[in-house]
Amino acid sequence: MRATLEISLYPLLQKNKEEEYKKIVKKFLSDISKKEGLVIESNGLSSIVYGDYKDIILLLQEEVRDYLKKYRSVFVFKIGKGTLSYSNK
């Protein structure tokens, strides 16, 4: 089954590292863009991930878990069935 995930990462302030959040977000985007079978579009507010449902869930299980262990952060997700893109009419 095809699915679409909207994901946002909000790193919480790291002690004495005010600009660190930009590096954390850019690293996360770089890491998830390496996943095969997924198409990722990013903007200033969130990223949209298109792909097979099982691959998207695997991304959540692996990458999100790792970032939550490593950084104080909050993730916001929305997931829906199909390729939910206005450009795919």
In which residue ranges do the predicted regions lie?
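Charge-rich, low-complexity N-terminal segments
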Residues: 1-89
